Design a protein with these regions (language model features):
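Juxta-kinase regulatory segment immediately upstream of eukaryotic protein kinase catalytic domains
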Residues: 2-29
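ATP-binding pocket architecture of kinase catalytic cores
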Residues: 34-207, 222-225
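All-alpha amphipathic helical-bundle segments outside canonical DNA-binding/catalytic cores
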Residues: 160-161, 288-300
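Catalytic-loop of the protein kinase fold
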Residues: 207-209, 214
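Hydrophobic residue at the +6 position relative to the catalytic HRD Asp in the kinase catalytic loop
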Residues: 217-219
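Activation of the activation-loop gatekeeper triad in protein kinase-fold domains
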Residues: 231-236
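Active-site activation/catalytic loop segments of kinase-like enzymes and analogous catalytic loops
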Residues: 243-286, 300-318
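Helical subdomain adjoining the active site within ATP-dependent kinase catalytic cores
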Residues: 288-292, 306-343
Length: 343
């Protein structure tokens, strides 16, 4: 979410959105709302909304969403509302709509000041080893804080079915692969087979983000050791926290080996903590053992390969606002091959 391009589509319907925002905010200046697509999002579409009243952010599914379970607006809204006031910072929900406004579910949230770090570090931000360690530690600590929250204490006791979570996750992503694959990729099929044959016992039950990474967080521009917000909760659930850790480590360590448009390589710059160091920090703060971590890391590779294939399908269907993500076919195969080395 680092740059914006003009929205020339009808995906945001300012003529309908403006009056709705005016009603919920009681500020008629939102009648003059304008929308810009924030590029870099790989699943749901994110728009910056501007008016004389200020700025907000809108989230909606891509046009012609192919895998509806991966674009659940209600899920994002519910978990963000529940986490408000906890140690995990999230934007406040301003408006939630089931489809009457745009023809698809969407929501509007507050715009949080700070930095989304994607392909490079902004000048003067985390340019020394101490700040880089602080940024990495902040990410690990926030993930541990999320996993420490009792779901029932914030109204999320029924947010998912923890029993059998890991097995269902493998099955779910295998099904999504079969639904979106357009060419055979033997490495993906073999990785799915190995994972299904060696599913570990769940380590614990926690609220999981599902796609936790540096560029799904907003970093405080004045203090890189503090996160201002965690974004993009569409894959959140109640399940095994090691699936979150495995995904976080995948993103943290895979930048140079993965399509540059999909994974930031910033954490691989000198001075940032290693994945092993951050995993140890997470384990220390959660009190959970790092059992079968290679399985969870392999699963993260499988999941990302399927996510990448889904992005490719949406790009081919012209459903991603014209964004270019490079050679996604190679990215799918390369990610699966790297996962096989762990499985």
């Amino acid at each position: 979410m680092t740059s914006a391009v003009s929205d020339t589509s009808l995906l945001t319907r300012p003529d309908l959105l403006g009056p709705a925002l005016s009603r919920v905010t009681r500020d008629d200046r939102w009648q003059q709302v304008e929308a810009e697509l924030i590029t870099g999002g790989k699943s749901n579409l994110t728009y910056r909304l501007r008016s004389p009243a200020g700025e907000l952010v809108l989230r909606r599914p891509p046009s012609g969403a192919i895998l509806t379970t991966a674009h659940d607006m209600k899920r994002e809204v519910r978990v963000q509302r529940a986490l408000a006031g906890t140690a995990v910072p999230v934007p406040a929900i301003v408006l939630s709509d089931d489809g009457g406004l745009l023809g698809v579910p969407c929501y509007v949230m507050t715009r949080v000041d700070g930095l989304v770090i994607r392909d490079r570090l902004p000048a003067g931000i985390a340019d020394g080893p101490a700040e880089r360690v602080a940024l990495g530690n902040a990410l690990a600590d926030c993930l541990a804080e999320l996993h420490a929250i009792d779901p029932a204490s914030i109204g999320l006791a029924d947010f998912g079915r923890p029993a059998g979570f890991v097995e269902r996750q493998v099955r779910r992503w295998r099904t999504q692969w079969e639904a979106s694959a357009d060419v055979p990729v033997p490495a993906v099929d073999e990785l799915a087979r190995r994972l299904a044959a060696s599913i570990p016992a769940s380590s614990a039950v926690a609220i999981t983000h599902g796609d936790y990474r540096l560029d799904n967080c907003i970093v405080d521009a004045r203090d890189p050791g503090r996160l201002a917000a965690v974004l993009d909760w569409e894959l959140s659930a109640l399940g095994d926290p090691l699936t979150d850790l495995g995904m976080f480590l995948f993103y943290w360590e895979s930048g140079p080996r993965t399509a540059a448009a999909l994974v930031t390589s910033v954490p691989c710059l000198p001075g940032f903590p290693s994945g092993a160091e951050l995993a140890g920090r997470w384990a220390e703060r959660t009190g959970l053992p790092l059992v079968d971590l290679d399985w969870y890391r392999a699963f993260a590779h499988f999941k990302f390969a399927v996510i990448t294939q889904g992005i490719k399908a949406r790009v081919n269907a012209s459903a991603m606002g014209g964004q270019d993500f490079g050679d996604l076919t190679s990215a799918v195969a390369d990610t699966a091959e790297a996962g096989l080395a762990l499985a």
